[in-house]
Amino acid sequence: FGVISDIDDTVISSHVTNKLKMILTVLLSNEHTRKPFEGVAGFYQALQRGAGGGEDNPIFYVSNSAWNLYSLLVEFLKLQKIPLGPLLLRDFGDHLLFSKEPEHHKKKNIKIILESFPHLPFVLIGDSGERDPEIYRDVVKEYPTRIRTVYIRSVNKQPTRLAAIDKLIEEIRPTGSQLVLAPDSEFAAAHAAA
């Protein structure tokens, strides 16, 4: 299987839902000062190795971060011992911070990956901060036999957001895939290992 993962607020704390905090984080931090969410490196290493431990499952990163952060993100992944893989980022421009449809970039690139590896099932990993659950639901519905599991890191604990994700869990269930709302990487890793 392959893995398609978001980066911001999934692998690394970026404060995407708070634009001011996000801008300050981008401007005032670097690959040495930014920190991954606890347990991310071990979880992604285990996914890459697979159940038997001897696989080399590919990991793709699809993010709405700008291409000018590419070097920082690659160095960050190396420093944190998070498996490397292709990073599909967005072009920088006026639309980047205030785009009404950031999901177009993600959905388009996820489809390209799925169509480039037509016989490979995938695990999708994202967060509840913005639109990852809805984007991944759409992907599961379009490719129902291709997505094994969707892991969503719970970063938005608002009751309305949690209720919306509960609804998405039920929408995905009939496809044979599942959406797992994970409080942390340890929970997701335990679920994946089961």
Placement of each model-derived feature along the sequence:
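C-terminal cap/substrate-recognition subdomain and adjoining C-terminal extension
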Residues: 65-194
